[in-house]
């Protein structure tokens, strides 16, 4: 049994993630936890899965506090007062998906060993429902958003800039515009009404999905556009010219803003060489893709900052959870005295290509075997996550997605990155034929 991917349990509603599964997760979690805080993003299936997992927790004798519709970082921050946190979300995935992500009191997602413990309990159905008079209590707390907001405002400086915030009809709508206004920003909202159908755009805040935000930034003369995903753990930006800032650029800018020389920065294997060169004297450590793996390494080596080019930024001084609301506030600090386009120009840039090839989950293992046999002849191989081949002029990474039926390709080189990408793409397509 393999329930947990790189970002918790996630799948299509009522097919891969069901109320029966959620009930069992609650029963398994309740075996060792006496208190849990539970939140959800706006997804249509959110309340259904929430009720099921709460039923399991209560049946195991665990007390539950519901905090309603909140962002994932809000839930993670609230977990400090409980034994664990449960977030019902599928993050950036489309509306038909739903998921469950579990959190520790320090804001760290459940690690591999904790996930395996839950999986083993479910597989063996080794549950321990309590007697009728020991069933857990359920209550509600409306203060989680306020507490998260106050924490952010205590850790950022004021800003007078004009910002357009596109929450993608996600959970960030409940907090981000308010935080930015309290900072002193002039805030214009876009797609900032929670709607689990995500009618305005795909929840993932990538370049393709942010066309309206780019137009709005230029039309309203904004200093910046900020976009979040369905649960606001991810955040990306548009500069004042309406240009998308890539994840590698964002990570490099945050590192420069937050860190001193000699800093330790943790990134996944698909991160650009730009980050290594953006902060001279720093140490860049690469991990498996997935914010939980980045967070684990940040904690292990006491790193200064970390993140993923997909839009997850981790500031360990405040939490080990990627926080798209805190990152939104931090980037306003960053552009207070200089434009985002000016800061972007100062970064070293290398041609980078990213893409995906559709691949059914059951065929991924075969495809990766073929990729390994072909690419091992091309350079030094690392298999920390997928297959990364380093060459004199650059590198290419082939990695199966942990949440979707896709294989991801990343290629970067000082020259010829497109050829590296095409080579890997062709190998995958040949293996699928």
From Swiss-Prot:
GO terms for molecular function: magnesium ion binding; phosphoglucosamine mutase activity. One of its GO terms (biological process) is carbohydrate metabolic process. The active site is at 91 (phosphoserine intermediate). The modification Phosphoserine is found at residue 91. Gene3D superfamilies: Alpha-D-Glucose-1,6-Bisphosphate, subunit A, domain 3, Alpha-D-phosphohexomutase, C-terminal domain. Belongs to the phosphohexose mutase family. This is Probable phosphoglucosamine mutase. It comes from Methanococcoides burtonii (strain DSM 6242 / NBRC 107633 / OCM 468 / ACE-M).
